[in-house]
Amino acid sequence: MPLTWKDSGLRWYWVVVLVFLADQLSKQWVLANFDLFESVKLLPFFNFTYVRNYGAAFSFLSEAGGWQRWLFTLVAVGFSTLLTVWLRKQSASLWKLNLAYTLVIGGALGNLIDRLMHGFVVDFIDFYWGKSHYPAFNIADSAIFIGAVLIIWDSFFNSKSEQDKTEEVK
């Protein structure tokens, strides 16, 4: 029997909305208050620094000439659709997977909007040690990372009762 939205992982879709709004509001704040490459030191190891990312994680393919914008758009739409279908098919009680999928979807959609509106992703979270800087990122990237970690965690530490719930839904 198909699950209703209340019984399925779709019940967790509020996380998508929360991540998306936090990401977009933070990026709009950066765009309104920072010039490109402007930096504000917040802690001895942490800045807000406005940079543009034309690629993916760690600026992967950022110098590819523009076609990557559409590749990453297709990837974001594809993964968001796939994870939404999976949410629809699994029990709302599988909190780790539901939270993981919704974090990834919210992050993917946040970066997708940037790519479509600006042609780049707004990054601004800048951790560093001495003169070594970790690549700048944003709230969407953080959500995707945390979601991926939860998916991996769940795959290694999924309890027998949670596996049974997943099997019942299939």
From Swiss-Prot:
It is an enzyme of class 3 (hydrolase). Its main location: membrane. It catalyses: Release of signal peptides from bacterial membrane prolipoproteins. Hydrolyzes -Xaa-Yaa-Zaa-|-(S,diacylglyceryl)Cys-, in which Xaa is hydrophobic (preferably Leu), and Yaa (Ala or Ser) and Zaa (Gly or Ala) have small, neutral side chains. Keywords: Aspartyl protease, Cell inner membrane, Cell membrane, Hydrolase, Membrane, Protease, Transmembrane, Transmembrane helix. Its EC number is 3.4.23.36. It holds the Pfam family Peptidase_A8. The active site is at D123, D141. GO terms for molecular function: aspartic-type endopeptidase activity. The chain crosses the membrane at residues 12-32, 67-87, 93-113, 137-157. It is a multi-pass membrane protein. PROSITE patterns: SPASE_II. Coiled coil: none annotated. Pathway: Protein modification; lipoprotein biosynthesis (signal peptide cleavage). One of its GO terms (biological process) is proteolysis. It is found in: Cell inner membrane. One of its GO terms (cellular component) is plasma membrane. PANTHER family: LIPOPROTEIN SIGNAL PEPTIDASE. This protein specifically catalyzes the removal of signal peptides from prolipoproteins. Belongs to the peptidase A8 family. HAMAP family: LspA. This is Lipoprotein signal peptidase. The lineage of its organism: Bacteria, Pseudomonadati, Pseudomonadota, Gammaproteobacteria, Alteromonadales.
